[in-house]
UniProtKB/Swiss-Prot annotation:
Keyword hit for NAD: no
Role, per record: Negative regulator of class I heat shock genes (grpE-dnaK-dnaJ and groELS operons). Prevents heat-shock induction of these operons.
The keyword Transcription regulation is annotated on this UniProt entry: yes
Listed GO MF terms: DNA binding
Gene Ontology BP, a term: negative regulation of DNA-templated transcription
HAMAP family the UniProt entry points to: HrcA (MF_00081)
Pfam families: HrcA (PF01628), HrcA_DNA-bdg (PF03444)
Transmembrane segments annotated in the record for this chain: none
Gene (UniProt): hrcA
The protein's name in its UniProt record: Heat-inducible transcription repressor HrcA
Keywords: Repressor, Stress response, Transcription, Transcription regulation
Domain of life where this protein originates: Bacteria
Length: 348
């Protein structure tokens, strides 16, 4: 339904939404005139609020004389009325500093990103690992532990590090293992699981075993990426008034633990879009209707995409949450780019 609001109605809606997001209370016409410095009478504002209510932008709680925004009103505000915001320079510097202080590995970055999103927005911070259309090998090492037992350490194009043990058909010294990895790395660099499995066919036993384990590790990583989610900041959300109802807090826990975001929602999103704000019924699943989700994609090389965002009640500071999500996505993308250093696979 396309509705043309007057400029005054737009301003009234904007002030009602922002006051409600700030206080959590219904907003009356008299208070709105005073706080928003509107140059009209409370009666005129009441009339416009009645029109906005009839158009489903505002609702009239039974326990209050004021109005609150509906889901439709919140969505209109975010799309048409909300002013773009940015994190302050001080916040941006502090966040970048935090990322330089942690271990320079993907899991540490993603856990920190979820934590920073939670602290900055006051909601649950969510981050998924980068998911490759096809995961590729970047580098691997073989480390001798005892006689025939070797530690295989590999790094993928998306920056994931994986370790596994393998038992060789015959013992090799560390010098021999290093020579083997130095010989194979240039041949295998940027190959996917299927290509490495083909290389294993007809290879001598030790090489075939190493190649098969590399292929298995890539398969494991691809599967793990589809089910992993970093979530931080639940304590921020459950302190909010909306979660005074125990069932809503329980529902949020079920959403996070049950994998609904990963298995149903994320595959339906377009990573080329910048920042998505999904409110209530936008999330389609009944379990997610009480919430809002703000998220965007970050990049790790040409073929890998991860998601990060915030999840919370529909009454949230949308402008600040969008600013936090946008900035964290740029920071994580920069870090992934530095780590990956891989070729542009799109270009061949």
């Amino acid at each position: 339904m396309s509705v043309q609001l007057t400029e005054r109605q737009r301003q009234i809606l904007r002030h009602v939404v922002e006051e409600y997001l700030r206080s959590g209370r219904a907003v009356g016409s008299k208070a709105l005139v005073e706080r928003a410095s509107l140059s009209v009478s409370p009666a005129t504002v009441r009339n416009d609020m009645s029109v906005l209510e009839a158009l489903d932008f505002l609702a009239h709680p039974h326990t209050s004389a004021g109005r609150v925004p509906t889901e439709h009103g919140l969505r209109y505000y975010v799309q048409h009325l909300m002013e773009e915001s940015q994190l302050s320079s001080e916040e941006q510097l502090m966040i970048r500093h935090q990322f330089r202080q942690v271990e320079q590995q993907v899991p540490s970055w993603l856990k920190l990103a979820a934590s920073v999103l939670a602290e900055t927005s006051g909601n649950v911070g969510l981050v998924t690992p980068p998911r490759a259309r096809v995961e590729r090998l970047r580098h691997f090492e073989l480390i001798s532990l005892r006689r025939r037992v070797v530690l295989l350490v590999l790094v993928t194009q998306s920056g994931t590090i994986h370790q596994s043990l393998l038992e060789l058909p015959q013992p090799l010294e560390q010098e021999e293992l290093s020579a083997l990895s130095q010989r194979l790395n240039p041949e295998l660099r940027w190959l996917d699981r299927a290509a490495i499995e083909r290389r294993a066919q007809g290879a001598e036993p030790t090489v075939a075993l190493v190649l098969q384990r590399l292929a298995e590790a890539l398969h494991f990583i691809e599967h793990q990426q589809r089910s992993e989610l970093y979530a931080e900041g639940l304590e921020h959300v459950i302190r909010q008034p909306e979660f005074a109802q125990a069932n809503l807090a329980h529902l949020l826990l079920e959403v996070l633990r049950g994998g609904m975001l990963l298995t149903w929602l994320l595959p339906r999103l377009d990573p080329s879009e910048e920042v998505r704000v999904l409110i209530g019924s936008d999330l389609a699943l009944r379990e997610l209707r009480p919430f809002s989700l703000i998220l965007t994609a970050y990049r790790s090389g040409a073929e890998s995409t991860g998601w990060l965002g915030v999840l919370g009640p529909q009454r949230m500071a949308y402008a600040r949450a969008v600013a936090a999500v946008r900035f964290l996505a740029s920071v994580v993308s920069e870090l992934m780019s530095e780590l990956s250093g891989g070729p542009d696979r799109e270009g061949g």
